Amino acid sequence: MAEISAKLVKELRDQTGAGMMDCKKALNETSGDLTKATEWLRQKGIASAEKKAGRTAAEGAVGSYIHTGARVGVLVEVNCETDFVARGDAFQELVRNVAMQIAACPNVEFVTTDDIPADVKERETNIEMGRDDLGNKPEAMKAKIVEGRVNKRLKELALLEQPFIKDSSLSVAEMVKQLAGKIGENIQVRRFTRYTLGEGIEVKQEDFAAEVAAMTA
């Protein structure tokens, strides 16, 4: 495979408005062919989605999902630019898919890694720095290992970084970008809440043997 230069990635980005990583992936998939890479991005719905990302998305919908057995429930707000799109089947399906994704991902706490507070990042870094397997590593190597582990952990906490449950070849972010490209509007997952039945409730543990003994004494 031909090496993809930074200059070629920048050229594709300038032409399409897609993100750097998306451009690099497109060029890798097409062996560095700029025209084919542009077509690849358009097919994925990415080429035009990035240019729309800066536009205001004030319409949208609050979606809900209750998992089978009513033990997990989700509320999620997804925004778009117009009420017309918000009422459309494609957008409504996306909102439901995002809600289902949240229900399926109990570890997810934030929409993106940028939303993760500094104290959470610091906590995760301290945890990784204290791992026993790093004790004899050189400081430079240790820092690199910790950075990689922390980044991996932060991605586990971010909704948009998760593999899409209906197509694991896509992340949730890529799935959203695809629809944004197809409908021609900026789409943003703004916030969500996940409820688990009984979460946070301390359940009293009964000593049934002692209870029976007391009743028969």
Curated annotation (Swiss-Prot):
The keyword Protein biosynthesis applies. Keywords: Cytoplasm, Elongation factor, Protein biosynthesis. GO terms for molecular function: translation elongation factor activity. It holds the Pfam family EF_TS. Associates with the EF-Tu.GDP complex and induces the exchange of GDP to GTP. It remains bound to the aminoacyl-tRNA.EF-Tu.GTP complex up to the GTP hydrolysis stage on the ribosome. Belongs to the EF-Ts family. The keyword Transport does not apply. GO terms for cellular component: cytoplasm. It is found in: Cytoplasm. Its main location: cytoplasm. PROSITE patterns: EF_TS_1, EF_TS_2. Residues 82-85 are annotated as: Involved in Mg(2+) ion dislocation from EF-Tu. The gene is tsf. This is Elongation factor Ts. The lineage of its organism: Bacteria, Bacillati, Cyanobacteriota, Cyanophyceae, Synechococcales. It comes from Synechococcus sp. (strain RCC307).
